Amino acid sequence: MKTYNDLYLSTRKTLRLAGVVSHDLEARLIVSYASGKTREELLTCSRVFLTNSKILNNVDEIIKRRLNGEPIAYIVGEWEFFGLPIAVNESVMIPRTDTEILTEQAINLLKNRPTPTRVLDLCAGSGCIGLAIAANIPGCRVVLADISERALSICRTNMLRNRLTRNVTALEVDVMENPPALLGIFDIIVCNPPYIPRSDISLLDVSVRDYEPLEALDGGPDGLYFFRAITSNWTCLLKDNGIMLFECGIGQAKDVKDIMEEAGFNNISIYHDRQGIERVVSGHIK
């Protein structure tokens, strides 16, 4: 008879042999989800014997799904971002560590601005960026904006889950159109837009290509379609000396910088992610 720890170890081994990079983390998540226990509870009952065969069956089923390419975040329905539990499903992209760079820079810039501040999170998806900002900047008001009503439903779930409904709202908008007047003006606009060149989508890992929403990936022929549209249509919502920050793909930072300069931005900065890749571009507008 297996203990919970035995189940974790066997799950980890299966994932490792299958080439899953984060096999340790994912094994813990799988056993936690399959058993209905928190990770903390699993630590306290690691030597307890499993008497419920349903848990073993659940683990086997989850492993099959994972080895077929389904992301673990979609299987368990949640991922952690900037210390916040973020609900996810196939309507939204899974929060990435790379996106924490965009969030960190926005938070650092907001700390130097007089309160209260207003932030617009365009192409919000799960809302992870705007929610992390709201959780870390007291008095900050955040609007999560996305064209997808399914994504906005996830945003609202995450607002409730993280008790941020008082200072965060979610709104359906199309970044290809002029912004609605009711939005007002903002200190900062953050955006992690679709930026994969269309011809590259078929080359993506199966866990991304076959599961994550195409509309959150497809950046047009050159991957820069949304950067052009947003700087053209949405810059007018920034206050004097307001700031726009974009996450971008590998090799895109210089092009995004040029697009922002053409739109009238100055003091443009490029920030690297933890792998040394140019990942975030920010600029000020007067």
What do these predicted regions represent?
Residues 1-47:
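Non-catalytic accessory regions of SAM-dependent methyltransferases
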Residues 15, 110, 159, 234, ...:
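Conserved hydrophobic residues forming the short capping helix/wall of the S-adenosyl-L-methionine
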Residues 32-109:
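Conserved AdoMet
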Residues 73, 196-199, 251:
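Active-site beta-alpha loop architecture of Rossmann-like, nucleotide-cofactor-dependent enzymes
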Residues 100-203, 229:
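Conserved SAM/SAH cofactor-binding pocket of Class I
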Residues 195-225:
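Mobile active-site "lid"/loop adjacent to the S-adenosyl-L-methionine
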Residues 221-284:
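Conserved Class I SAM-dependent methyltransferase catalytic core
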